[in-house]
C-alpha cells in the first residue's frame, strides 16, 4: 500500500508520517523537497541542456547539485532546496524552474503531473502532500481554476490512479485559524520573529487569485484555506471513495490508522 498524507499547513502531517513510518517500517518516506516519483514541489524540473548550463553557472556547487539531481528520461530533477549554500542567488535562480506558480503553461503542468503518475508503479511508500496540497493550491491561486475545473482534473487523474495501490490519510482541521496560529509560533526564530507566516501571507496576497478577487490579508487567506480543505475532502468523497480516511487534526487515535 502507498499512503498519501494530506491536509492543510499546520494540520500535523509530519507527526502522522512519523506514526505511519513506525507502523510500516518497510515503507519509504517522501517528504516535501525530497526526490519524489510523483511530486515536484521544491524541485527544479529542467531539460538535459539546461541542467548542464546550471552546472556550468554554479561550478563551485557542481558536486552538491549532482548529488541532489535525478534523471528522468530527457529531464533532470534537482532537489535544490536540499542544497545548503551561501552562494548568492542560487536558490532564487533555480526556483524559476519549478512547475508551480505559473512557471509552466496549464497544459504542460497537467501533462507533467499526469505523465509522472502514469509511470509510477511502486508500492510501500508514505508520501507527504503529494496528491492535493501543491496541485490544488496552484490551481486555485495561480490558475484561478474553478472548483468544477479542479474536480475535472482529479476525475481524470483518478482514472490514471484507479489500479494503483493507495490510501489517502486526510487530516481535517476543525479550527483552521487556530491551527495557523500554532504554526506561526512554531515557525518563528529564537527571538520570536515569525519566519513562515509573512512569507505565506505575501505568497497569497501576490497570487493571481487574490488580485483577481480583490482580496488580501490574514482573514482572506484563512478563508482560502477553509475553502481548499472543503474542496480536497470533496475530491476524496467523489473521486476516491473507499480509498481515504479523514482524521481530526491532532485529535485522533492510533487505532484509526488501521485501515
Where are these regions (language model features)?
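P-loop (Walker A) phosphate-binding loop of NTP-binding proteins
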Residues: 8
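ATP-binding Walker
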Residues: 11
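Walker A/P-loop
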Residues: 14
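Conserved substrate/cofactor phosphate-moiety recognition/catalytic segment
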Residues: 21-76, 139
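Glycine-rich phosphate-binding loop used to anchor ATP phosphates in small-molecule kinases
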Residues: 65-161
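Conserved phosphate-donor/acceptor-positioning beta-strand/loop module used by diverse small-molecule
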Residues: 128-130, 147-202
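NTP-dependent small-molecule kinase module
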Residues: 195-259
Amino acid at each position: 500500500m502507498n499512503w498519501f498524507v494530506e491536509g492543510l499547513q499546520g494540520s500535523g502531517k509530519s507527526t502522522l508520517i512519523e506514526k505511519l513510518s513506525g507502523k510500516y517500517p518497510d515503507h519509504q518516506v517522501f517528504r516535501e523537497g525530497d526526490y519524489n516519483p510523483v511530486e515536484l514541489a521544491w524541485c527544479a524540473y529542467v531539460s538535459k541542456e539546461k541542467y548542464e548550463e546550471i552546472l556550468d553557472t554554479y561550478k563551485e556547487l557542481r558536486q552538491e547539485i549532482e548529488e541532489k539531481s535525478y534523471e528522468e528520461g530527457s529531464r533532470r530533477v534537482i532537489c535544490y532546496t536540499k542544497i545548503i549554500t551561501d552562494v548568492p542567488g542560487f536558490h532564487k535562480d533555480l526556483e524559476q524552474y519549478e512547475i508551480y506558480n505559473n512557471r509552466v503553461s496549464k497544459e504542460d503542468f497537467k501533462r507533467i503531473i499526469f505523465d509522472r503518475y502514469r509511470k509510477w508503479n511502486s508500492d510501500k511508500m508514505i508520501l507527504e502532500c503529494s496528491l492535493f496540497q501543491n496541485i490544488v493550491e496552484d490551481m486555485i491561486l495561480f490558475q484561478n481554476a474553478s472548483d468544477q475545473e479542479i474536480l475535472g482534473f482529479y476525475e481524470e487523474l483518478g482514472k490514471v490512479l484507479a489500479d494503483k495501490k493507495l490510501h489517502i490519510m486526510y487530516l481535517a482541521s476543525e479550527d483552521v485559524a487556530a491551527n495557523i496560529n500554532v504554526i506561526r509560533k512554531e515557525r518563528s526564530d529564537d527571538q520570536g520573529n515569525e519566519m513562515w507566516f509573512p512569507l505565506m501571507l505575501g505568497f497569497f496576497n501576490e497570487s493571481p487569485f487574490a488580485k483577481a478577487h480583490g482580496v488580501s490579508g490574514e482573514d482572506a487567506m484563512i478563508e482560502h484555506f477553509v475553502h481548499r480543505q472543503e474542496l480536497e475532502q470533496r475530491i476524496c468523497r467523489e473521486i476516491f471513495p473507499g480509498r481515504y480516511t479523514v482524521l481530526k487534526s491532532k485529535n485522533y487515535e492510533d487505532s484509526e490508522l488501521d485501515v
